[in-house]
């Protein structure tokens, strides 16, 4: 099984006015990876998690991305899915300085080793951005 499952084929459309979506988020990774083997799981992944949940405008995408990064970090999930969600957070307006503060804050609740692993991924994602 590829560790890229759940971290590809998400089309986060153009944003306007900060984090306001102009089009829906579309996900196909579930169907692409597991459509024939686990069609119900693929449906929940693509249509419910990324379709309904990520398109719910009650929480803006920047906040939703921060929540997702912290949730994955707190579970110790430091594979490509966490890196992907760190990139999404960056794309939704989370600066390097904010990401460092978020990971540092979460470290006290989720654990220091998990923060180290998350910082390593965040450094890769933010490596081309000048420090703010």
Which residue ranges define each predicted feature?
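Acidic, glycine/proline-rich low-complexity segments that act as flexible tails and inter-domain linkers
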Residues: 1-63, 91, 115-132
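Short, solvent-exposed interaction modules
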Residues: 75-76, 91
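Amphipathic alpha-helical core segments of compact helical bundles
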Residues: 50, 72-75, 104, 108
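Short runs of predominantly hydrophobic/aromatic residues within well-ordered alpha helices
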Residues: 63-66, 96-99, 115
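A cross-kingdom feature marking solvent-exposed beta-strand/loop segments within repeated
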Residues: 82-104, 120, 125
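Short, structured motif recognition centered on aromatic/hydrophobic residues
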Residues: 64-72, 102-103
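Short acidic alpha-helix initiation/capping motifs at coil-to-helix transition points
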Residues: 43-46, 76-82
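C-terminal structural segments of small proteins and small subunits
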Residues: 106-118
């Amino acid at each position: 099984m590829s560790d890229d499952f759940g971290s590809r084929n998400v089309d986060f459309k153009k944003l306007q006015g900060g984090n306001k979506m102009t089009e829906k988020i579309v996900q196909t990774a579930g169907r692409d990876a597991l459509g024939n083997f686990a069609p119900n799981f693929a449906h929940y992944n693509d249509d419910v998690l990324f379709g309904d949940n990520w398109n719910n405008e009650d929480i803006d995408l920047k906040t939703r991305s921060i929540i997702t990064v912290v949730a994955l970090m707190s579970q110790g999930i430091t594979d490509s899915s966490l890196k992907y969600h760190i990139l999404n957070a960056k794309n939704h307006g989370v600066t390097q300085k904010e990401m460092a503060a978020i990971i540092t804050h979460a470290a006290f609740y989720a654990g220091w080793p998990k923060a180290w692993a998350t910082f390593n991924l965040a450094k890769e994602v933010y490596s081309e951005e000048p420090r703010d």
